[in-house]
Design a protein with these regions (language model features):
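A structural signal for short hydrophobic beta-strand segments in well-ordered beta-sheet cores
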Residues: 141-144
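Internal helix-loop-helix
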Residues: 52-119, 161-167, 298, 302-309, ...
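A short, Trp-centered hydrophobic/proline-enriched beta-strand micro-motif
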Residues: 119-127
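C-terminal helix-coil-helix/basic helical segment that borders enzyme active sites and/or dimer interfaces
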Residues: 31-38, 288, 292-340
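Glycine-rich beta->alpha junctions and the first turn(s) of the following alpha-helix
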Residues: 4-8, 197-301, 351, 384-385
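Glycine-rich phosphate/cofactor-binding loops in nucleotide/flavin-utilizing enzymes
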Residues: 3, 71, 76, 234-237, ...
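A short core secondary-structure module
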Residues: 153-197
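Amphipathic, small/basic residue-rich leader segments at the start of a protein or domain
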Residues: 1-90, 111, 115, 269, ...
């Protein structure tokens, strides 16, 4: 019996065939090469095409309201990755759209959601601050009431895709005297508002992220999400979705999309490296052992679920990519048209940071899965402060 391919019903097989043909038409070699060169992880033409075809809306909606079935959703995720679709920022947009739906006013929902699902609006995250690290609750970006609106001042790091987005899901401090989890308010800030400045930052893997500055940015109260000083409730919902700690559905097909797609890149990179070696080299016991060990590690990481998979995949990419460079020798450090080892090596560094650092995830596993206490960051007795 062949377990390499799942037998689909006629409806799902047709869905897969149509989706595969659609992606082959819009995700061209030029799109993939341009995305690799720019590091944007986004292509507006592809995004608008997906919106016009109704795929974005069906991905966002629950099945009961016209969204994908569980099997179709899995097909969708796999085909998106298979086509190398510049895609990672849709997960952010969809997550923020959920927050707008759950916590926004009717007026804000009407303004944002329809154009988001058509692909015309994109949404990004404004959590981390230049000096804040992973603890986003230490927010210093201030929002102060001004009549029936708000004035915002501050800055945010890692506002990825802000240069293609229309709104930022912005965490602000509205009550500096209160405990940090009771001082926060969330806003959906239009990025074309006066006083917003988006500046690029290049990561070691060639991706583009941004730092955004907010200087006397004035917005109406209708852009507030949730209660004043109740932003932690709004934020926790989004963070649980980003970290993959909440149940996505009842089918067990939860998936941290970015991690899985990068694991598939590792699989392709491994194949490219093996194919680039002369037959005599591959036949050497030491090389065959290292390639085989890499395959086993990659397969184990891909099959690891939830939070554990997030750690396993990022760790595998970080540890296996230098192994592949070493096997290739001097050529392993050179860029090429193929998916080369040096690209995977550079990709592995930020992969352990975005979506929540590996340290944060290990602490989450320790607390929520193993039942251990919260981590203690205080210096040991007698140690240096």
């Amino acid at each position: 019996m062949d377990f390499s391919e799942v037998v689909l019903c006629d409806e799902d097989r047709l869905f897969q065939t149509e989706l595969r043909a659609f992606l082959a038409d819009v995700v061209t070699a030029d799109v993939i090469n341009r995305d690799r060169q720019t590091g944007d992880n986004f292509d507006e033409g592809v995004h608008l095409a997906l919106g016009a075809a109704g795929y974005l809306e069906r991905d966002w909606l629950p099945e009961s309201q016209g969204g994908f079935s569980a099997v179709q959703r899995r097909i969708w995720e796999l085909e998106i990755g298979r086509a190398h679709t510049p895609w990672f920022h849709w997960g952010t947009t969809a997550m923020v759209a959920n927050a707008v739906h759950d916590f926004g006013s009717a007026e804000l929902r009407d303004e944002v959601l329809a154009k988001t699902l058509s692909g015309h609006y994109r949404l990004c995250l404004g959590f981390t601050e230049p000096e804040g690290g992973s603890d986003v609750a230490t927010c210093k970006t201030r929002a102060v009431r001004d009549g029936d609106g708000w004035v915002i001042n501050g800055s945010k790091m890692f506002t990825s895709n802000a240069h293609h987005a229309h709104y930022v899901f912005l965490l602000t401090n509205t009550n500096p005297g209160a405990p940090k989890h009771q001082s926060l308010t969330m806003f959906l800030v239009p990025l074309d508002a006066a006083g917003v400045d988006v500046q690029p930052i290049r990561t070691v893997d060639g991706d583009r992220t941004n730092i955004t500055f907010y200087s006397d940015v004035r917005i109406a109260d209708r852009y507030r999400l949730g209660d004043v000083d109740g932003g932690w409730t709004v934020l926790r919902t989004a963070l649980d979705a980003e970290h993959g700690t909440g149940e996505r559905d009842d089918s067990g097909l939860q998936k941290i999309a970015t991690m899985t797609e990068h694991a598939l890149l590792l699989a392709e990179g491994l194949d490219v490296v093996a194919g680039s070696l002369a037959g005599s080299v591959v036949g050497e016991d030491s090389v065959a052992y290292r390639l085989g060990r890499s395959v086993a590690r990659m397969e184990a990481a891909l099959s690891t679920p939830g939070m554990y998979g997030r750690v396993a995949i990022a760790t595998a990419l970080r540890e296996l990519s230098p192994e592949l460079m070493d096997v290739q020798g001097a050529s392993g450090g050179l860029a090429s048209a193929d998916l080369d080892a040096q690209y995977l090596f550079r990709l592995g560094v930020p992969m352990g940071i975005y979506g929540g650092t590996l340290e944060v995830f290990r602490n989450m596993i320790a607390q929520h899965a193993l039942g251990l206490g919260r981590p203690a960051y205080a210096p040991a007795a007698g140690g240096r402060s």
